[in-house]
Amino acid sequence: MTTFYTVISWLSVFGYWLLIAGVTLRILMKRRAVPSAMAWLLVIYILPLVGIIAYLSFGELHLGKRRAERAKAMWPSTARWLSELKDCQHIFASSNSEVATPLFQLCERRQGISGVKGNQLQLLTTTDDTLKALVRDIELARHNIEMVFYIWQPGGLVDQVAESLMAAARRGVHCRLMLDSAGSQQFFRTPYPAMMRNAGIEVVEALKVNVFRVFLRRMDLRQHRKVVLIDNYVAYTGSMNMVDPRFFKQDAGVGQWIDMMARMEGPVATTIGIVYACDWEIETGKRILPPPPDTHIMPFEEESGHTIQVIASGPGFPEEMIHQALLTAVYAARKQLIMTTPYLVPSDDLLHAICTAAQRGVDVSIIVPRDNDSMMVRWASRAFFSELLDAGVKIYQFEGGLLHSKSVLVDGQLSLVGTVNLDMRSLWLNFEITLVIDDDGFGADLAQVQDDYIARSVLLDGEQWNKRPLWHRVTERLFYFFSPFL
């Protein structure tokens, strides 16, 4: 009997170290950023059991077998659709401004299509304006309405959107609503899903959170897009979830959320439609490819319209596309770079690009909220402040609420607006969407909004920052260690 227990003990020890060695080899064989690999290895060797479980749950990007098969199956039809779209040559811009050319070239090479011209574009900077405009567009819808949001929380003007959407479905408009399971978990506990389905709306809970499938799919892979598509001609996207800030997270102590959305009319809506169609098929298995765009662009539309490129990221989309786009935009800056983000936990490459821009004379400003709804992100963000300040970057801390807008403005000409935070999750993991606009008129509108943010912010003083308590520095470095996981 003693021999039996001895053998079991040795086998357990051998199995334990074999498991650690196997996971270590897996981490080393995967091509990932060095800080991320080192962080995972340290966690696994300091807390082996916790580290291994965490890595198997969150360490690698995988959709799950069923969704991966759907993503693979949809690609041939999507490729044919894109090929047919490319035949509509006159909706695509043939040239771009000097500062925008590298980014538009990258997008064309990696995504297969150029920027789409002849679009009307409006920047909406208040929740009231956005939701009221959305209700009006829903009431005018004739054929189809597609929506995807990370968070939908009933209350306030959001209920008017829900009522108008149900009314549209009842009068025969085909309505689809896809909401992230984790972000909208409160919504799925309300009567609204049943009410909407009874009205004829297809409601889908995307990327369902299921503890029993934690090793089969990454639970922190989220559907983070915010998109509305109406009649394949009107589209919205930006940072705003479907929430009324007067009723959302009032007990978080960070004030009301501040967002921006872009409303578009024109052929670019079709490219947003193909992104939605891919998401819908991955989640439901149903194919809903959008019709071709209205390719007849009037001369006045071409003259006054905006050139827009849509960048989508996530499993099934070009790998690291958002990250590459941001790097390209930062390196293209010659005079000024302004960035707004609620969560500042950049990759090493992006951090160095921003610092290098400031060091070569570009006027670089980053606007972040003073208070944040995530304690980990708040402390991890501060770990980057010293390096940014030393490089000459101006950091503004917004005091008028939780600044949730995500925007980049380069030299007053090239604008990026969308759902992407400057953190690891947005850059490499989640389903995200960003608009790239090559237009100094829209750039002036965005600059005006960013100037308003700056006016409601406090400029971080480098000397004062260096006098912060030692325990602040220690806490920042502790959370910085976990930044590859955030």
Swiss-Prot record:
* Localization: Cell inner membrane
Q: What is its EC number?
A: 2.7.8.-
Where on the tree of life does the source sit, at the highest rank? Answer: Bacteria
Per UniProt, what is the membrane topology? Multi-pass membrane protein
Q: Which GO terms describe its biological process?
A: cardiolipin biosynthetic process
InterPro entries in alphabetical order: Cardiolipin_synthase, CL_synthase_A, CLS_N, PLD-like_dom, PLipase_D/transphosphatidylase
Catalytic EC class: transferase
Q: What Gene Ontology cellular component terms go with this record?
A: plasma membrane
- What broad class describes the main subcellular location of this protein? membrane
- In this protein, which residues make up the domain named PLD phosphodiesterase? 219-246, 399-426
Gene3D superfamilies named among the record's database cross-references? Endonuclease Chain A
Which keywords fit this entry according to its UniProt record? Cell inner membrane, Cell membrane, Lipid biosynthesis, Lipid metabolism, Membrane, Phospholipid biosynthesis, Phospholipid metabolism, Repeat, Transferase, Transmembrane, Transmembrane helix
Q: Which GO terms describe its molecular function?
A: cardiolipin synthase activity
Q: Which NCBIfam families match?
A: bac_cardiolipin (TIGR04265)
Q: What does this protein do?
A: Catalyzes the reversible phosphatidyl group transfer from one phosphatidylglycerol molecule to another to form cardiolipin (CL) (diphosphatidylglycerol) and glycerol.
**Can you tell me which family this protein belongs to?**
Belongs to the phospholipase D family. Cardiolipin synthase subfamily. ClsA sub-subfamily.
Q: What is this protein called?
A: Cardiolipin synthase A
Its gene name is: clsA
